[in-house]
């Protein structure tokens, strides 16, 4: 103000000991415009005694954990550890149904709760299927849902009948393929179908005893799984009745296999092989020779 004079005794304040900025600082370009170089983000230095941790972000996936096999369980048979029932469904083949031409059998396996366990496929030549019928030699490959072969069943050619103790049927069980874990051996009996469940050293572990008449009409046909001295039953192999038309026109059968949940996995696998052998011996029609249940 023109002509303003400070009052008497007024003295100006001394300057501060720190620099006084003049004007406003230039703003930091966090989002540079066109033609401007991006400004790197400045991370403040950590306070004394504190470490600086990186900000959370996507973590790169590491290598997969190595698979640890269960002790005493062949690789691929882990699905047998926690189950006590297997349902086996044989697929119906149209060529076999309408033309009577014997084809390789195909099966689906599920647990008692409906969980898919895998598929089994027969491998045999056409001449053996036509000439030997249900007695034909074959190889069955059982693959898990990932199409990995985990079990192999081998049946050699044995010509014989139940009325004499020669040419008894047999099946070898391998898991993994190439490693024998047991055998299924038919035991001679004049009236009853009997089988011995053997371990890799061909020592008996269990017995399977069937009924005198296996051609059940309207009911299931049960084969009891018993201890090796046949004193008590520990499981069952059941051929389930599929209906009059299906039983008369097709060879497609349904089986149920029951065993204790704490049974050795290898013995469970051999019992599975026994189920397939029973299907071929008693419920598979012979090529041009009538039902195998009469002559096996």
Curated annotation (Swiss-Prot):
It holds the Pfam family Scramblase. Palmitoylation regulates its localization to the cell membrane or the nucleus; trafficking to the cell membrane is dependent upon palmitoylation whereas in the absence of palmitoylation, localizes to the nucleus. It is a single-pass type II membrane protein. The chain crosses the membrane at residues 267-283. It catalyses: a cardiolipin(in) = a cardiolipin(out); a 1,2-diacyl-sn-glycero-3-phosphoethanolamine(in) = a 1,2-diacyl-sn-glycero-3-phosphoethanolamine(out); a 1,2-diacyl-sn-glycero-3-phosphocholine(in) = a 1,2-diacyl-sn-glycero-3-phosphocholine(out); a 1,2-diacyl-sn-glycero-3-phospho-L-serine(in) = a 1,2-diacyl-sn-glycero-3-phospho-L-serine(out). Residues 1-11, 25-34 have a biased composition (Low complexity). It comes from the Eukaryota. Changing residue 163 to A: Complete loss of palmitoylation, mislocalization from mitochondrial membrane to nucleus and reduced apoptotic function. A lipid is attached at residues 159, 161, 163-164, 166 (S-palmitoyl cysteine). Residues 1-58 are annotated as: Proline-rich domain (PRD). Residues 12-24, 35-45 have a biased composition (Pro residues). A motif (SH3-binding 3) lies at residues 66-71. One of its GO terms (molecular function) is SH3 domain binding. GO terms for cellular component: cytosol; mitochondrial inner membrane; mitochondrion; nucleus; plasma membrane. Keywords: Apoptosis, Calcium, Lipid transport, Lipoprotein, Membrane, Mitochondrion, Mitochondrion inner membrane, Nucleus, Palmitate, Repeat, SH3-binding, Transmembrane, Transmembrane helix, Transport. A motif (SH3-binding 2) lies at residues 21-27. It is found in: Mitochondrion membrane; Mitochondrion inner membrane; Nucleus. Its cofactor is Ca(2+); Mg(2+). A motif (SH3-binding 1) lies at residues 7-15. Residues 1-266 are mitochondrial intermembrane. Residues 1-45 are annotated as: Disordered. Belongs to the phospholipid scramblase family. The Proline-rich domain is required for phospholipid scramblase activity. Catalyzes calcium-induced ATP-independent rapid bidirectional and non-specific movement of the phospholipids (lipid scrambling or lipid flip-flop) between the inner and outer membrane of the mitochondria. Plays an important role in mitochondrial respiratory function, morphology, and apoptotic response. Mediates the translocation of cardiolipin from the mitochondrial inner membrane to outer membrane enhancing t-Bid induced cytochrome c release and apoptosis. Monomer. Forms homooligomers upon binding to Ca(2+), Pb(2+) and Hg(2+) ions. Interacts with PDCD6 in a calcium-dependent manner. Interacts with PRKCD; interaction is enhanced by UV irradiation. This is Phospholipid scramblase 3. It comes from Mus musculus.
């Amino acid at each position: 103000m023109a002509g303003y004079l400070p009052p008497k005794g007024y003295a100006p304040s001394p300057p501060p000991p720190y620099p006084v900025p003049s004007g406003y600082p230039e703003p930091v370009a966090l989002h540079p415009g066109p033609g401007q170089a991006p400004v790197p983000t400045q991370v403040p230095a950590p306070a004394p005694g504190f470490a600086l941790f990186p900000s959370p972000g996507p973590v790169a996936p590491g290598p997969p954990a190595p698979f640890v096999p269960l002790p005493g369980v062949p690789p691929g048979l882990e699905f047998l550890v926690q189950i006590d029932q297997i349902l086996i469904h044989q697929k119906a083949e149209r060529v076999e149904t309408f033309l009577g031409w014997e084809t390789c059998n195909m099966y689906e396996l599920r647990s008692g709760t409906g969980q898919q366990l895998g598929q089994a496929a027969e491998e045999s030549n056409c001449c053996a299927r036509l000439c030997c019928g249900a007695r034909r030699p074959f190889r069955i490959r059982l693959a898990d849902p990932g199409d990995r072969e985990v079990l192999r069943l081998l049946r050699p050619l044995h010509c014989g009948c139940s009325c004499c103790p020669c040419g008894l049927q047999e099946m070898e069980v391998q898991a993994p393929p190439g490693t024998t874990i047991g055998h299924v051996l038919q035991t001679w009996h004049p009236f009853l179908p009997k089988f011995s469940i053997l371990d890799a050293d061909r020592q008996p572990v269990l017995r399977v005893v069937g009924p005198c008449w296996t051609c059940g009409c309207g009911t299931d046909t049960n084969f009891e799984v018993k201890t090796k001295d046949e004193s008590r039953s520990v499981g069952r192999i059941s051929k389930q009745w599929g209906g009059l038309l299906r039983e008369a026109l097709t060879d497609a059968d349904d089986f149920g296999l029951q065993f204790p949940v704490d049974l050795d996995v290898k013995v469970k696998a051999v019992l599975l092989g026994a189920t397939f052998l029973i299907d071929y011996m008693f419920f598979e029609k012979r090529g041009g020779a009538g039902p195998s249940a009469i002559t096996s």
